[in-house]
Amino acid sequence: MGEKTIRFSVSLPEDLLKELDSRVIKKGYSSRSELIRDLIRELIIEEKWDSETEEVFGVLTIIYDHHQRDLTRKMIDIQHSKYVNILCSTHVHLDHNNCLETIIIKGKPSEIEKLSIEIGGLKGVKFSKLTKSSKVEL
């Protein structure tokens, strides 16, 4: 971030400022400015996800029972059918029965959401969560 930083002021009601300061401490930020910068970036990412013209990224985290009949094959088939969107995946053995997989996906928001629902809805998937992101050049 080699851009010039510009200082400006913000007026807030006292209760809202207390909430802000509480979050700065809770999340370990070094200053209010750091928290506000992250909140603005989050807003930009949300807006990109609301647009169908932007390429965005997502990380799908799933936990599943690898003993579930045909589940692994179905997940691999889905990923291979969408190889243009799937950047990579990481597989971790949690215990004898359960695996955790993260799948990094790129594409239009609707493509990523559809793919996440398709994988997350398979029988044997115990947990599925899509974390939304995008390139933020700020």
Swiss-Prot record:
Keywords: DNA-binding, Metal-binding, Nickel, Transcription, Transcription regulation. Pfam families: NikR_C (PF08753), RHH_1 (PF01402). SUPFAM superfamilies: ACT-like, Ribbon-helix-helix. GO terms for biological process: response to nickel cation. Binds 1 nickel ion per subunit. InterPro entries: Acetolactate_synth/TF_NikR_C, ACT-like_dom_sf, Arc_rbn_hlx_hlx, CopG, CopG/NikR_regulator, Ni_resp_reg_NikR, Ribbon_hlx_hlx, TF_NikR_Ni-bd_C. Its cofactor is Ni(2+). It comes from the Bacteria. Coiled coil: none annotated. GO terms for molecular function: DNA binding; DNA-binding transcription factor activity; nickel cation binding. Ni(2+) binds at H80, H91, H93, C99. Belongs to the transcriptional regulatory CopG/NikR family. Transcriptional regulator. This is Putative nickel-responsive regulator. It comes from Persephonella marina (strain DSM 14350 / EX-H1).
